[in-house]
Amino acid sequence: MINFNFFMNDVVRQAREEIVSAGYTELTTPEAVDEAFKRNGTTLVMVNSVCGCAGGIARPAAAHSVHYDKRPNHLVTVFAGQDKEATARAREYFEGYPPSSPSFALLKDGKIVTMVERHEIEGHEPMQVIAKLQSYFEENCEEL
């Protein structure tokens, strides 16, 4: 019989590796969140999770959406359910939006611009999420 904790640790490790290899910086402490979010420019925050729609839709969208003429200056991620304090701190910046994972938040100069929430990810195709993210990049980001 498979050890559930061993299995989940492997799922979490793979989820972390997938988003980091897509160019996102992991924020694992509240201090790291504050440091990252106070930078000038645009920041895309991917709120990672172990659910199926994170692996099948959100992380692929996170990886592919940034291959676009206009994109955020900074790409970061927090892991809901894993790095709880960092995720809680990040959510303090997402004023007006309920906690949701997976999700994406677009910040400009540390202020929330918009979000793609779980209900806009779950049950959708990765290309739909990519198109939504890129429309936000088009409106809010500069060519890099």
Curated annotation (Swiss-Prot):
The residues forming a coiled coil are none
Note the superkingdom of the native organism.
Answer: Bacteria
The name on file for this protein is Bacilliredoxin BA_4378/GBAA_4378/BAS4061
Q: Which InterPro entries match?
A: BrxB/BrxA (IPR009474)
Family from the record = Belongs to the bacilliredoxin family.
Pfam family for this entry, one: Disulph_isomer
One GO BP annotation is: cell redox homeostasis
